[in-house]
Structures are given as structure tokens and as C-alpha cells.
């Protein structure tokens, strides 16, 4: 039974999205339906968690807009996601960055991973 479920899920998983990690700053382009028009809106922020795996995988992006923290959770394989761009790689030592919720200003930043 599990093999059948895995085979069906493997067909439906999106392969056009880049691989990103927790701590990365990403731009998520989301399709929004307003009346009869459809447009694309960008949501940029730091990935604070990734959950599950396979078809049910979700990730949460956090940003601070006008002094207020905004978190948005996206299903990885959702059709509303147009594309994802990685703005910068972050260097973190945790799987969940919930501690960023309590921080303000420069202390809420994630160190950038320098690649050579």
C-alpha cells in the first residue's frame, strides 16, 4: 500500500522549485485571484521552518512589514506558487527559528553563508 501512495505522490511533486534551507531569505511569487483578474504578488522573507516531506511539505516565511512581523505558511507543491527565488543563503544551527519572533532590529537577522 505504501508503495502505491509513494508512486502517486512522486508524480505530483513539483520539480521546478529550487531547494532551499531554513535561514535562507527567499522570494515567493504567489498567484492571487482578485475578482476575475489574476496577478502575481511577491512575499520576501526568511524561512523559519519546513515541515513534513513529500507531497504534504510546507514552509513558513517570516518578514517584518512596517514594524509588524508577518508569517505566511505555504504548501510546497501548491499551484498558487508561481516561482521561488533564493535571495541569500543563511547560516543557522537550528531546524526551527522560532526565536526570531522575539527579536527586533539587527538581532533578528540571520548570518549570511559565504560561499567560495
UniProtKB/Swiss-Prot annotation:
Pfam families: Ribosomal_L19
Stretches of the chain forming a coiled coil according to its record: none
A GO cellular component entry from the record: cytosolic large ribosomal subunit
Keywords: Ribonucleoprotein, Ribosomal protein
GO MF annotation list: structural constituent of ribosome
GO biological process, alphabetically ordered: translation
Annotated function: This protein is located at the 30S-50S ribosomal subunit interface and may play a role in the structure and function of the aminoacyl-tRNA binding site.
Family as reported in the entry's similarity comment: Belongs to the bacterial ribosomal protein bL19 family.
Protein name (record): Large ribosomal subunit protein bL19
Gene: rplS
